[in-house]
């Protein structure tokens, strides 16, 4: 009888151990005096109000926590303010995980010294730095974080005059709106013209502003057949024929697009363009974003989605009313 009892207890213990192994024990994350617990077999987690402090020690704790969750595919941690450097170091270590977080990009503005840092959520549909000529610039290394922002449809990072490589735009091929104006080095240290090939992959692009951005070759734009608004003024563009097939164009600004002379391009070229895109209003008189460029329903939609007038208002993509 005693032997049977021992055997039964042994079997029961084994079963409990197997069940414990199968179900897994809870995994605990402790950072900054906060605790988060989840099951070992979790596939998606949301840290909620738990924030990961910006220290090597706390990010080491986060990594140790993630290492115990091999089935994870999604981690939301939007309460955590994470720098581009932290995200670009963390995310590649866990390629199977989609991270949802809030990226913090410092901003200095001599006219707005109280200006808070830029906040870019990885699930944002629209983002603008809302820069002006007094804002500090962010080069292309910062914008590598766009690879973790797959939902972006509208992007305004104009007035960033240290950007020399547009390769990061390959991460956001679904953009409908792109503003990259005034990205020419203001000190005149211009360097070679910028390759805009990534823009040619944006098949749904409708609004593009790239005036004064050290651009010479616009042949990639021939692929952007849905473009309605285009500003290419004050650049080094000699060949305008790539625009001939853009039948959706309704507004084209190209004053001084051949060079930085501040002069209109020859009337013969404008006429040739007009013959190919007869439904487009071509402006060869206003410099950069002057005159009617920042007027009309499309610009009003931009001002709303990018919160130009209300800097604290959340930014979100809004389609143009006349969008097909």
Please describe what each predicted stretch is.
Residues 43-61, 71-82, 94-145, 151-164, ...:
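Concave beta-strand-loop units of leucine-rich repeat
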Residues 28-40, 44:
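Compositionally biased P/S/T/G-rich terminal and signal peptide-adjacent segments
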Residues 9-19:
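Bacterial N-terminal signal peptides
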Residues 66, 90, 146, 169-170, ...:
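Hydrophobic anchor residues at the C-terminal helix/turn of individual leucine-rich repeat
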Residues 19-26:
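Sec-dependent signal peptide cleavage junction
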Residues 1-10:
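Bacterial N-terminal signal peptides that target proteins for export
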